[in-house]
């Protein structure tokens, strides 16, 4: 059974921007699976938080976080999904040299 509140620690990934792992503060990151650590990199402590089911979180549901910590020992918050098409447009623009009016007239 998931407790009504839990003191958790939040760690940022050293490999992937906007990826975080939430763990019970008492447990820490020592019990995280090796496969997760390979993907995640060295955990960088962000802060500790007293979490309740009703606590609003930016990109996660508090009850889901608490349940995952209870069941698996951690909750992994993945980076937000970006629109692949727009990222392709931005990358293409960055790789295309600027063309001026004079270049077009030649």
Swiss-Prot record:
Q: Which residue numbers delimit the YcgL domain?
A: 6-90
Q: Which PROSITE patterns match?
A: YCGL
PANTHER family referenced in this protein's UniProt entry, alphabetically: PROTEIN YCGL
> What is the name attached to this protein's record?
YcgL domain-containing protein HCH_02617
**What is the organism of origin for this protein?**
Hahella chejuensis (strain KCTC 2396)
Lineage at the top is: Bacteria, Pseudomonadati, Pseudomonadota, Gammaproteobacteria, Oceanospirillales
């Amino acid at each position: 059974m998931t407790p009504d509140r839990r003191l958790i620690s939040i760690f940022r990934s050293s490999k992937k921007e906007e990826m975080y792992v939430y763990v019970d503060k008492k447990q820490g990151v020592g019990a995280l699976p090796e496969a997760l650590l390979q993907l995640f990199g060295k955990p960088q402590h962000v802060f500790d938080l007293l979490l309740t089911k009703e606590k609003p979180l930016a990109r996660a549901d508090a009850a889901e976080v608490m349940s995952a910590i209870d069941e698996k020992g951690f909750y992994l918050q993945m980076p937000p999904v970006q629109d692949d098409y727009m990222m392709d447009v931005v990358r293409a623009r960055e790789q295309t040299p600027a063309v001026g009016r004079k270049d077009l007239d030649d």
